[in-house]
Amino acid sequence: MNGGKECDGGDKEGGLPAIQVPVGWQRRVDQNGVLYVSPSGSLLSCLEQVKTYLLTDGTCKCGLECPLILPKVFNFDPGAAVKQRTAEDVKADEDVTKLCIHKRKIIAVATLHKSMEAPHPSLVLTSPGGGTNATPVVPSRAATPRSVRNKSHEGITNSVMPECKNPFKLMIGSSNAMGRLYVQELPGSQQQELHPVYPRQRLGSSEHGQKSPFRGSHGGLPSPASSGSQIYGDGSISPRTDPLGSPDVFTRSNPGFHGAPNSSPIHLNRTPLSPPSVMLHGSPVQSSCAMAGRTNIPLSPTLTTKSPVMKKPMCNFSTNMEIPRAMFHHKPPQGPPPPPPPSCALQKKPLTSEKDPLGILDPIPSKPVNQNPVIINPTSFHSNVHSQVPMMNVSMPPAVVPLPSNLPLPTVKPGHMNHGSHVQRVQHSASTSLSPSPVTSPVHMMGTGIGRIEASPQRSRSSSTSSDHGNFMMPPVGPQATSSGIKVPPRSPRSTIGSPRPSMPSSPSTKSDGHHQYKDIPNPLIAGISNVLNTPSSAAFPTASAGSSSVKSQPGLLGMPLNQILNQHNAASFPASSLLSAAAKAQLANQNKLAGNNSSSSSNSGAVAGSGNTEGHSTLNTMFPPTANMLLPTGEGQSGRAALRDKLMSQQKDALRKRKQPPTTVLSLLRQSQMDSSAVPKPGPDLLRKQGQGSFPISSMSQLLQSMSCQSSHLSSNSTPGCGASNTALPCSANQLHFTDPSMNSSVLQNIPLRGEAVHCHNANTNFVHSNSPVPNHHLAGLINQIQASGNCGMLSQSGMALGNSLHPNPPQSRISTSSTPVIPNSIVSSYNQTSSEAGGSGPSSSIAIAGTNHPAITKTTSVLQDGVIVTTAAGNPLQSQLPIGSDFPFVGQEHALHFPSNSTSNNHLPHPLNPSLLSSLPISLPVNQQHLLNQNLLNILQPSAGEGDMSSINNTLSNHQLTHLQSLLNNNQMFPPNQQQQQLLQGYQNLQAFQGQSTIPCPANNNPMACLFQNFQVRMQEDAALLNKRISTQPGLTALPENPNTTLPPFQDTPCELQPRIDPSLGQQVKDGLVVGGPGDASVDAIYKAVVDAASKGMQVVITTAVNSTTQISPIPALSAMSAFTASIGDPLNLSSAVSAVIHGRNMGGVDHDGRLRNSRGARLPKNLDHGKNVNEGDGFEYFKSASCHTSKKQWDGEQSPRGERNRWKYEEFLDHPGHIHSSPCHERPNNVSTLPFLPGEQHPILLPPRNCPGDKILEENFRYNNYKRTMMSFKERLENTVERCAHINGNRPRQSRGFGELLSTAKQDLVLEEQSPSSSNSLENSLVKDYIHYNGDFNAKSVNGCVPSPSDAKSISSEDDLRNPDSPSSNELIHYRPRTFNVGDLVWGQIKGLTSWPGKLVREDDVHNSCQQSPEEGKVEPEKLKTLTEGLEAYSRVRKRNRKSGKLNNHLEAAIHEAMSELDKMSGTVHQIPQGDRQMRPPKPKRRKISR
């Protein structure tokens, strides 16, 4: 109909230069172009639509002059001069509304249809193109709808699909088309997507709001949904508006025809921003406003704006057009139900009603749907709303009082038929809106009203809203409840998902999938974001956010980012929706599988998505999340996200300002960036995805979002210095930012982690970086919580948020910490990935959480939120926990990691690696719905990180960057000063950071952060301090580091666990082990163990990160792993040391191998860095490794040194086999560490060394190192346990551990080793990764059964891990595959490879460890015939564990968790990891081979 030919850009049709807007009509100019809002609320975005509209029966043509000259009356040229409206005009408009039967009917019909048109939403959704909106609206005119639908489809396809293939857009379009956005909504929606700022302005423009009939306010506020809905029928519009978001809802609440009141309220709401826009367009309008005001006001609108802008497809008009028709007929044709059903079909995923296809309208969908096509709109709109409004709401409320205004707006027009829609909308609104307490009032009323409106549109908005508010708030956790979220139940998967995702994804299918997928992921994200937004607003909300958010938000976060990322991925420019539509569908489908939380996500998504957070969140954090804050900026959710981000930004701003002076600018940038991010998140994320997204672009939505955000930020604001150009905008941005303030790292990190998440949403990177200074702080106080709660942390956000909040809500710093923590949780995945990619500095760091300096942190870090975001709520050890968590992929993590890595990457040409890492992180993040996935992701990230770390080793600068990254992580940890130790560590880290910041390039600096981190981990490092220092001295880069770190770390050395001497990267790895180990380590171990056990007993997942090289090895370990590590650590420190020693030995080999790979790939540079980075392990060991790694090919590694080489090679190979997969880099590091740890005085070491092809003296050196590492070994052992997969290599290297790992790795692994270089041999491992891995680790692996090269079992391990985490998420697998590469030399990665089932030398008595290392060189050999199935390995592991229990205090909870994990792994991996029987047999005696197959 009207959408017959919805122009892609409503503004396409430039009318005459000067125009007079007809009485009763509104002309809105937003980014998407010009929208004409008819008295009935229809949105016309182009002459085509106008013609269709005018020719459509039942459409309101009041106010048009008699001789109607379309070009004269309707000018769609945004630049055209418009006759200023006078008060008279306004009054005339009102009169028209009074006189216009359409307007009155619309209200009445909307109300009526709300109750009777549940199917419409379907219809809306159904409209395939994204004209779902239109469809619903059109339903009454089947024919018209069809044409509209087609047009819509076209338009949407063009504008929405092409522009932003996001279901969001579609949804928005649908919503728009459906109802109110005929012109406006779509444009608004599109605007939202495309040009949030503009749309906000335009839609949000007072014009929009003013169009009483149109529900001007709705136009203004919830421009898209509201507009559309209102335009075509209040009822319809309402729903759509409702779905659209709180703003819309508000608008809707006020019947669309409340143009004036709506307008007013909208204005009011939007006052901070654009008047109505903000409110109105939760997404579009708000976007506009947000964009514009985002900087000033952390307005959801801003976020929204971004979203819409992103979604730029003005062509939403097509949908709109459709909607207009339907809308026009909305009232008349409440009957569009027929079309709606298709919508439903299209939106199949909708929860309940067609309307809810998006699931956004779940609560209100039925009524709204029933209400009329508009209702359908709501469905589609719902999505939109979710995306937009919720985002907006979430964002907005926090961002501005406007939300309340918004809410009030609805209140103003309580009776309008869109109530049903409104309800949804309100729900969104409420949820989102609710977020802000202040805003909530209105929002509550309005939101509830809207949300509740479903029952009675008019239902007292206040009452309803209130109800809804209360309802939505907590249950939906804000974001998800916003649209559908308000109603928890409505917030069904569909609802939530639909809401958030749908908003993002135009297509139902995508939406469904995405939504469902995002339900989990997006929702949490959204929830997180919502929380972020809401947290500040309402204390309750944050709580809900934390709780719900955690559950829902996380998915939202992840999901959102994914969607958004997808969105962005597809639509390089803005159309998150478009992109989301296509990419999201595909990825979401995967993710959906991955996201068992889909329903949850959906629910959450609804609320969160309703906020638009889902998408937005996605953009925002994280993937990780989001990973999330970046989410905010995502496509449709971008609006909400933008709003959220806005809010976060504003809070960030405050906190950051307080917290970080320098980044004030950054904040501005960030803000801008976020705004831009919102506007450009898609491109950014798209870029990011394209850049590093190959494998897992959306895996970590949070990260992607963050990336997007960052990119967007970086694109639009380039806020991150030098980060703007990085294709991993996020990484770049963040990196740049991070890098920008390397010296400020501590501050920045603190902020970044915090902001990384909160702001992260906006600018994952920028945010991070900006967050660096400003953002993190802004969260710090209230925002942090919000951010944490909100998906701002990205995927981890929700969990991280919740965790972070609960974990580190202590002080601002704590706050930061909290934020960081959540961020970290996100980061862990998100940041982590980035880091991983970068150099694993951050990535591995995130892992550090569990084994972090403070064991408690470890404990806390145990929370690997469902999303797999390893929240690692390390309360005890925020630093470590935070660090790792900080690297959690969500934002801090990813952002962090990305930031840091990006920093280093960016600066050191490592942006791409980081991106891949980031991407890899993202997928993990998302898929990490399962901790497994997350862990794997982390691992993956770690591996890439290790790769980067290797690079960093190779490249001092890179190392520096990594260090910076690490520092960022550390700073993140600093962010979590709540832990004294962590604080100490932070201090140390900060010092290191300062050092690093000062000498980012110096390898030591690079080592420092990680070293610090690891030192935290490495309690043992003290003992090794002398050696370490010596080693450090030996190592050029390390020299400085040891001094610096030692100087800075010594204080924390004991306290933090082992901040001290173990400064060099290799020590970092050792530190990781040492963390648990060491004199302080013992206590630390106990503390960690207790924390882990505590967490385990609480059912939390503990993530233990182990990094051999402080630079690149901070690998997150799943709770199981953490528990294992703890268990290992529980045992004799020495025992652990021994085990770790063995592990490290093997691991070092693996690390070296990885380094070798790096060298192979990096050539000379690696050796050089090896000297620097590898020096991390030890000069001697380094040399040895250098020789073997750098110069030694597979052959050398395999057995160039026959005598020791044979055995060691075997062990090493085995070790490498896992490390190749698990920790290629860590393997390298490990070997170095092993060298450092001359645990096996000559035999084992030589054995290990031979694989390394090290000279005897080197071996001696290594032995020396090994001895030094003895204690570290224990820590390492724990770490290895933690990083079982990483340890797999190490274990493989270790005689027994090797065996254990061999066992872990199935025969396939050996086969892989045999295949060593067959990239395909690694099932899940990405071929390229595998290739590189094999290239580096594989060469020597080729001949070694257990070579570092990811063997099939290793690959399988990863694959199974992937499967465990996200069986259906290809990204996840890719991520996992990347992971191996990310490990740096000496990285003690967990080997979160899927297949990593057991940790060969997990818990063993020292003598056992020694024996194992020394006496089992052969044992280290993994022979295919000896490889056992995972089950066998698990059984053996269990036996060993039981036996080990005596030496290691494995607590029942831990044990149970381990058992569960093992069984789970067994199920998932099955025979994937066949542990060599010999190894297994040998290993059983060795408890250290704990299988933490998490």
Curated annotation (Swiss-Prot):
Entries under CDD domains matching the protein: PWWP_MBD5 (cd20141)
Protein name as catalogued: Methyl-CpG-binding domain protein 5
Biased segments, Basic residues type: 1483-1494
PROSITE patterns: MBD (PS50982), PWWP (PS50812)
All copies of domain PWWP, residue ranges: 1385-1409
Start and end residues of each stretch annotated as Disordered: 123-152, 200-274, 329-350, 450-522, 594-641, 809-848, 1154-1173, 1345-1375, 1468-1494
Keyword set, alphabetical order: Chromosome, Intellectual disability, Nucleus, Ubl conjugation pathway
UniProt note on tissues of expression: Detected in heart, placenta, liver, skeletal muscle, kidney and pancreas.
UniProt miscellaneous comment: Named 'methyl-CpG-binding domain protein' for homology to other methyl-CpG-binding domain proteins and the presence of an MBD domain, MBD5 and MBD6 may have evolutionarily lost the ability to bind methylated DNA and are recruited to heterochromatin by alternative signals.
SUPFAM superfamilies associated with the record: DNA-binding domain, Tudor/PWWP/MBT
